[in-house]
Amino acid sequence: MEFTPRLQQGILLRRYKRFLADVQLSDGSEITLHCPNTGSMRNCLYPGETVWFSTSDNPKRKYAHTWELMTTPDSGLIGIHSGQANTLAEEAINKGIIKELTGYDSLSREVKYGDENSRIDILLQGAQKPACYIEVKSCTLLEDGQGYFPDAVSLRGQKHLRELMHMVSQGHRAVLLFVVQHSDIFSVAPAAHIDPEYAKLLKKAVLAGVEVLAYRCEMSPTEIHLAQACVVRV
């Protein structure tokens, strides 16, 4: 996925009220960005470091600028826009990058499923194979060299694991796909120290037949895309 038009840069001052961040531009002026990330952003906030943001020409938006990337102190990059994970996953599936998810005839987004009033991120269907239900999660938390999910207690994430297990019990294929938007994460594990119930459910889901995949993103201020698989430690 290319960033069009090109991203602009500034220096992070602060994130506040969950969905807002103040940034200083090169001329010394300050602007407020929309922060499109519902998580805690634990270990992803570095005041004084460079951020990259997009700008919308939609006059109805209260905040025209959206925070896209964060530069880490060691010059790494973090994808802040967690909502892009689904788009990145769809793009990678369509291009055949995720080898485990090839060979289907159609791809649908946000389809109702399960018994807890949920919508699946991606549904793959093919004439010669079971339907494949894919839940996509953005992984950005790095601690002691290990990537973790979630970065806060996630009741919604727990619900999605139950739904995936339900789909397996109905004879379908179910996949949890971690989209790793941190250049220094090379393996993903459940954050049992943050959400022990999620970690327990994930182990249960794997035993029930839910597949878990993780793919790293290659990121730059001009584009971002899924590139290669990484290790999952359940």
Swiss-Prot record:
GO terms for molecular function: DNA binding. NCBIfam families: sfsA. Belongs to the SfsA family. This is Sugar fermentation stimulation protein homolog. The gene is sfsA.
